[in-house]
Amino acid sequence: MGDAKVARTYNQDHKARQYAKGRRRVSAYIAWSYPAEANRNPAVLDNRFSTMTEVRRVLWPAYEGPQWDPSRFQQGIGGSLELFFWAWVRFQRVVEEVTGHALPMFQRVDQAGFALPLDERVLADTDTLFVFGLDHMVTEQVPAPAEIEAVRLFLEREGTCLVIGPHHDVGQSPDLQERNLEYLHHGDALVPRQQRFGSYTRALMNGLGIPVENRWGLRPAVSAAENGRIAPLTIARDLDERGWLAGVRNFNFHMHLPHYAVTTEDARSVHVLARQPIDLSRPHPFTNAGNKEFNTLVWMRPEGRRAGDVLVVDSTVFSTLFGADESLERFWKNIATAG
């Protein structure tokens, strides 16, 4: 972010955006406690983010530039958390370009320890709400009943949209050999044998009656003919009535993406719009069971008192940490402009 054309600020209160027809107000809510994540013990192997030192070692020399020097950038787990914010900047800029409104990034508990439940302070000036489920389960982030009710009322407003994405659930099995098989499948040395995310988003979805659950961490297939570009999505275009995936071929490659399992038999209420082909060269319990694709985008159309749309998709899709292209930006724009 060294190329920013305006000064950056910190420690400011959010200023509400005024409603303007045709210009959606988009907000993102990161459902983690930053201190709870940053203060995890690096001596503990599982259920934590990497330290920045570990990132630099594994991805060397990608993070050896002066902006990553210890005199300028945190080297502990906090450094890895800040990489997320670096990687969301392009998404924020694209949204602002097409809506005319800045995209605020709220945190459940921020770096300074300020807590922000998901309430009207976030929702009052929001038309499209992203909830990023990047909280490790061990930090025990759970929405209060009042938060669930606030989001329920938000979705009763005409034209609203909730985009929610619990991150991956790696190593849920007590069988250590199965955990190791998962690890060898995704191949990311920075992800431990057990890394379970999304208590907050899981509980929020349960409270709202969204019958979807994040499972596994699966490695997408790539196309050898296109220099390793991620394999195209399998898209149910006949179900995509709102055009969420218009002009979209693919999302971005990431070594361990969640499968969004639909937990209801009611095919009318939940639609799997996109599936991602899996790298079948690396065994995994999910592929061993005969699966070749995982659900990567799920949509619930307005129904009953819920006047807003619900999309379930991983937060990785809105980050450039793992790459971004024209197809991905088109998806961002589709969501930001859907009215």
Residue map of PLM features:
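Short, surface-exposed patches at the edges or C-terminal ends of soluble domains, predominantly
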Residues: 2-339
